[in-house]
Amino acid sequence: MMKDGLYDLFCESLESLALKPGQQLVAALGGGADSQTILDLLMRFRQQNPQYQYLAIHLDHSFHPSSADWSSTIEHAAKSYGVKTVFEPLNVPIENRQSKEAAGRESRYRRMAELTEDDAVLLLGQHRNDQIETFFLQLKRGSGPKGLSSMAAIQPWVGSRRLCRPLLSVSKEDILSYAQQQKLTWIEDDTNYDTRIERNFLRHKVVPLLEQRWPQFGNSVLRSAKLCAEQQQVMDELLQEKLYKAQKHKSHFPLSLLSEHSAAMQRALLRVWLQGQEYSLPSYEQLEQIRLQAQSATDDSQMQVQCDGYSVRYFQYALWCDNNTGQLPADCWLAEANVNLGEWGTLSVPDALLTNNNELRLTFSLTSEKLAKPGRQGRKKLKDWLKQAGIPPWLRARRPILELNGKYVWVAGLGWFSYQVIEKTEFDSLQLPEPDWVSSGADSYRQL
């Protein structure tokens, strides 16, 4: 493919995104010829399209002893374009039974989402050869149509962000030819030839042998991946329609919906909903645990199926996803209206609570004292108010609580409570604005 042909293909990919002026286009730089080609094509595109924002990101997870030198080389090449760049070292936590490569990939994508705007388009250099290898890896894992679809040319990402792979139909040979013609600088990572790594084994041992025997084999793989993607899209559309008709509101998925269908349909419905909630899909075994346990679950059974980064629970005839949070913030006295709770979000309180020598404390501890709500008859324990509000048991201890002069006055999700502050003067919470709790998602729940 001629270099102008590659550029035309790149432009067609971006035009299909229906970009808006000011939207951010981000080149993800890994250092190889493919990502350097993406950057060069993007910079050519910038010359004719200055109405967008442009950014190049390289994250060094230090897996290779020469990675720091490589980063310096890549950064110098990127800055020669005069584009805004972000070059950072990246700490990669590796969990049990997780490969180093998978951990690095997850950490990179997570950090790039943090560094980009909500509607950004992240441009990736993955190509035809990568797509064929991905198909084989999914086949090895026993994947269905969704997995065998491999990588999409354009796909949703975090928030309103999207991933775009303009070179997905282009061979590695054509990319190298372009990079050489443009005299680009790139890194040859020697670990790419380590056939102990699954993808490298496929790249150097398996795919060349198959294409030597059947020259059109690669094209057939790409066609199968495309057909799987189309089949999956049709199935998802039908399942989403079925879910929509059954839901009373967006976060609710009644278990009665599962009882109306076969086991295969139950699994498909669960997969589609989890995907729509932006959770990673569970394994087949985990999905079966969810499906089977849900059929006999009760509020007292404390059902909990652990998945990757979340767990599935049962409450009030529905399944819920819990984000598997860490330690709660420590109780603290408040001297300012705005409080940063780290991974739990932010809390803004009315200034009136911080005047008149009031002692205002933030806590997550549930009191056994009975509380009254303005305009409501009777007094109840806080746990009973939370239960009445339909808040699942595992979330009841995760609600920020404001304690004024030793008395609970506000609970996130429940609102104001009333009490006597000084002698017989009633605390008039109805005249105070509601505190603003913006959750970062660490405490949040979603219903299946």
Curated annotation (Swiss-Prot):
ATP binds at G30, G31, G32, A33, D34, S35. One of its GO terms (biological process) is tRNA modification. One of its GO terms (molecular function) is tRNA(Ile)-lysidine synthase activity. It is found in: Cytoplasm. Ligates lysine onto the cytidine present at position 34 of the AUA codon-specific tRNA(Ile) that contains the anticodon CAU, in an ATP-dependent manner. Cytidine is converted to lysidine, thus changing the amino acid specificity of the tRNA from methionine to isoleucine. The N-terminal region contains the highly conserved SGGXDS motif, predicted to be a P-loop motif involved in ATP binding. This is tRNA(Ile)-lysidine synthase. The lineage of its organism: Bacteria, Pseudomonadati, Pseudomonadota, Gammaproteobacteria, Alteromonadales.
